[in-house]
Amino acid sequence: GNLPFKAIVTLVNQGEFDLASTQVEVGLSGFLAEDFGVTAADKGKLKNQPPDDNPIARKKDSEGNILEAIEVSVPFPSKADGDDFNYARPLPGNRPFLFRAEVCYRYGAQVVSEICVLKNMIDIIDDAPCDPSESKSVFSSASPLGITAFRQNVVGKDKIQFSFDIVHSGSGDVFAIDPNLDNARIHILNALIELNRATPDT
């Protein structure tokens, strides 16, 4: 053909955490690569390509203004390859071609809730400031995996138990970084608990 071109995939980090370009992989599929001048040896260059810059998350400045994330791009073929796509077959008229981008990336989620800790979790006084045996409200950041239905249960005079549901939203798939799932589970949850005692009796 006489119209060489590149396919540009643009990405915007809508999460709360910055990403390095090495933590994002983009692939291009949905079309017959040979028709666009891609040899069998070069097909691998259409997979697992990083963006040209780090996808930085949006920020909030000291005055509370939201600073939106800046788009980063992934060109196909990559800049290092030099060559462009070029449709090699006769094209009698306008014909649409579907290019599909597949993105795999790391992400994190922040979840905040309140728990109830009393001096005596079984013999609760009438004016106790909270109930140690009830479901708690959850405030979760947007991510493909979120925590819902956070629950607290009393299992002893000075013991409590937490349970929660991890829900997958969206149409993507979830992959563990570590192929050993049992070891990967150790890194799923990092909890920070802050205790504020209301009175000496609670």
Model features per residue range: what roles?
Residues 1-202:
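Non-catalytic macromolecular-recognition regions in eukaryotic signaling proteins
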